[in-house]
Amino acid sequence: MKKRHTVNTIKSAKNSNKLVMITAYDALFAKLFEPIVDMILVGDSLNMVFAGRSDTLSATLDQMIYHANAVCSGAPSAFVVLDMPYGTYINEKEALQNAIRIYKETDVDAVKLEGGKEKADLIKTLCQNGIAVMGHIGLLPQHVRGQGGYKVVREADRLMEDAKALEEAGVFSIIIEGVKPEVAAKVTDAVQVPVIGIGAGKETDGQVLVWSDMLGFFEDFKPKFVKQYLNGAKLVKEAVSQYAKEVKEGSFPSQEFSY
């Protein structure tokens, strides 16, 4: 059995072992991923993947807690990070109340929230109260409506300031999204905590992908940075089509599958 990660072992992976992170929203897939990856992210992307919404903004804290518990049940030895959904960390008081609720009602190891140096004081408050925090800079999905879409972030100086401010505030790692590889590499070198990339090139300390993207289940849209390791949608459609065909023609269930 693989040794369970902690905040300290994640931090110690900086400049040594590439960290592998993947999303999961249920016990079934979490159990499959647990022995392979370093971290599982219960991302607010579930609002799009699981609930079929157009963005992440309407995900609720109740919804996130429900899925976090499913993931923790399926992967009890995994290092699990939970996204704090939009609107749950508007100020320090609300952020702390909601983060404490997450820790009380789930077994997740850490929370993740979006934002740069403007969130540093808030993050510091969480960390001082025993909450492990993963930062998220660059392209911020929770800001997609206000920014007019998903756009690559090019301001290197701002990203460096953001990363350093989050590190000083106490994050144990940072996700950097939608950033040119050379910029992400500079940010990674500038801080002592692991930087996990998504659409940010290969010079970060690790990578994270949405499981349904990398396994080819999400057919509506494929981001440029996603490599599909499986055409899951095609395989599922073929299998269900074969099942439907056998039911229609009366060949299933055969004697082999009957009591």
Swiss-Prot record:
It is found in: Cytoplasm. Mg(2+) binds at D44, D83, E114. GO terms for biological process: pantothenate biosynthetic process. It is an enzyme of class 2 (transferase). Its main location: cytoplasm. Pathway: Cofactor biosynthesis; (R)-pantothenate biosynthesis; (R)-pantoate from 3-methyl-2-oxobutanoate: step 1/2. 3-methyl-2-oxobutanoate binds at D44, S45, D83, K112. One of its GO terms (cellular component) is cytoplasm. Its EC number is 2.1.2.11. The active site is at E177 (proton acceptor). Homodecamer; pentamer of dimers. Catalyzes the reversible reaction in which hydroxymethyl group from 5,10-methylenetetrahydrofolate is transferred onto alpha-ketoisovalerate to form ketopantoate. This is 3-methyl-2-oxobutanoate hydroxymethyltransferase. It comes from Nitratiruptor sp. (strain SB155-2).
